[in-house]
């Protein structure tokens, strides 16, 4: 039998049907050869620079990764370590968690049994009342840290009450305030929160001079700026603590510092906070998790390990702008805590890109197409 038997032999006429001659469909005298110098379709669709920019933004998104939790590396998925992991889960949830809940409840009982009478009976003695309330706030924050089995190591001199000074720190979670507050009763600048956190803000934390604002209200900025200036001038005011990033970052990066804290004409005392993620990631992603669930996550971990550095106070240099001063302090905090600096505004986390930004990108792309047309 011939070797070609069983194979489909395609005739020339069949090939002609599959691949018709384009010239047969053109008017007489026309040719498919384009005149030299004309724009080809290949040139018009050459958008490789735009695609390169878009792909680069996806692959190396230095903004989004500032607000992502780092998943722990799996270590227990083998036959030898998995039983140990299961035993650890039982210990953390069935032994440590109930003990920590009892510790926190006991702390609240002591705190409220003292705070309410002091607030009611010492209304006319503001100096004494504020001093006792300051001690009580430090105490309840210590109970909170104990409920996570917090292992916190402080470096440097303890903050003191002095006029015309402000403390600034990098921000990972709302527990930053608790970790710092157990050592010194700071008056903090904080976003107004709903629920039980908002109740504590408007009652207990109000007693130490904390200042609240609503990020969505533009008029709050002027009110807060005035309160800041008045607070730093007070000789008896609690030390003022500001988180100039304005949002929680995952403790691997620092975003831009707001310049408001650096234009108060006072001494700035930097504080660097670094969490060890060996047991739990202390980063609070407020978009995905409530603060209550965040606390439960901490209370069911083995421990929260943290280091705090009180760095050398800084003053603005001659000829230095507020933005330059803020960047210099950010350099100090980033270097001490081992954090990477990124040139992003943390408030972009709460807002969508402006339509003007999209219009500028569209205009830039249109200009590149027009420039290519003019070249032809």
UniProtKB/Swiss-Prot annotation:
Protein's name in the database: Glycerol-3-phosphate acyltransferase 9
Membership in a protein family: Belongs to the 1-acyl-sn-glycerol-3-phosphate acyltransferase family.
Region called Endoplasmic reticulum targeting, residue ranges: 369-373
Amino-acid positions noted as binding sn-glycerol 3-phosphate in the UniProt annotation, renumbered to this chain: 209-218
Region (Glycerol-3-phosphate binding): 242-262
Main location: endoplasmic reticulum
Gene Ontology cellular component terms for the protein in this record: endoplasmic reticulum; endoplasmic reticulum membrane
Any one GO MF annotation of this record: glycerol-3-phosphate O-acyltransferase activity
Keyword presence, Hydrolase: no
InterPro entries according to UniProt: LPCAT1-like, Plipid/glycerol_acylTrfase
Motif HXXXXD motif per record, residues: 171-176
Top-level division of the source organism's lineage: Eukaryota
Compartment list: Endoplasmic reticulum membrane
Membrane topology type: Multi-pass membrane protein
Organism: Arabidopsis thaliana
GO biological process: diacylglycerol biosynthetic process; fatty acid biosynthetic process; gametophyte development; glycerol-3-phosphate metabolic process; lipid storage; phospholipid biosynthetic process; pollen maturation; seed oilbody biogenesis
Transmembrane domains' residue ranges: 79-99, 102-122, 135-155
Record's catalysed reaction(s): sn-glycerol 3-phosphate + an acyl-CoA = a 1-acyl-sn-glycero-3-phosphate + CoA
Keyword vocabulary terms for this entry: Acyltransferase, Endoplasmic reticulum, Lipid biosynthesis, Lipid metabolism, Membrane, Phospholipid biosynthesis, Phospholipid metabolism, Phosphoprotein, Transferase, Transmembrane, Transmembrane helix
EC number annotated for this UniProt entry: 2.3.1.15
């Amino acid at each position: 039998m011939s070797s070609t038997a069983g194979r489909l032999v395609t005739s020339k006429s069949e090939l002609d049907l599959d691949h018709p001659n384009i010239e047969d469909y053109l008017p007489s005298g026309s040719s498919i050869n384009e005149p030299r110098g004309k724009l080809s379709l290949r040139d018009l669709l050459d958008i490789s620079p735009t695609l390169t920019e878009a792909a680069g933004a996806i692959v190396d998104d230095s903004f989004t990764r500032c607000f992502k939790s780092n998943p722990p590396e799996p270590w227990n998925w083998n036959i030898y370590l998995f039983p140990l992991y299961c035993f650890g889960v039982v210990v953390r949830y069935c032994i440590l968690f109930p003990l920590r809940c009892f510790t926190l409840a006991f702390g609240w009982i002591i705190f409220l049994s003292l705070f309410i009478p002091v607030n009611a009976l010492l209304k006319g003695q503001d100096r004494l009342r504020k001093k006792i309330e300051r001690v009580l706030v430090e105490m309840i924050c210590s109970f909170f840290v104990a409920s996570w089995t917090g292992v916190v190591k402080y470096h440097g001199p303890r903050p003191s009450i002095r006029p015309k000074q402000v403390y600034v720190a990098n921000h990972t979670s709302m527990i930053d305030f608790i970790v710092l507050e157990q050592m010194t009763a700071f008056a903090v600048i904080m976003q107004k929160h709903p629920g039980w956190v908002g109740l504590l803000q408007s009652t207990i934390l109000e007693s130490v001079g904390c200042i609240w604002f609503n990020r969505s209200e533009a008029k709050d900025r002027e009110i807060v700026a005035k309160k800041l200036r008045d607070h730093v001038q007070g000789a008896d005011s609690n030390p003022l603590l500001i988180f100039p990033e304005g949002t929680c970052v995952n403790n691997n990066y620092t975003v831009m510092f707001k310049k408001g804290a650096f234009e108060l004409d006072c001494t700035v005392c930097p504080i660097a906070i670094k969490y060890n993620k060996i047991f739990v990631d202390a980063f609070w992603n407020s978009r995905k998790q409530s603060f209550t669930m965040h606390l439960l996550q901490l209370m069911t971990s083995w421990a929260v390990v943290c280091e705090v550095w009180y760095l050398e106070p800084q003053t603005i240099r001659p000829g230095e702008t507020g933005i330059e001063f803020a960047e210099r302090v950010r350099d100090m905090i980033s270097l001490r805590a081992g954090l990477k600096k990124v040139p992003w505004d943390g408030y972009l986390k709460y807002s969508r890109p402006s339509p003007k930004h999209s219009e500028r990108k569209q205009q830039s792309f249109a200009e590149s197409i027009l420039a290519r047309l003019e070249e032809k």
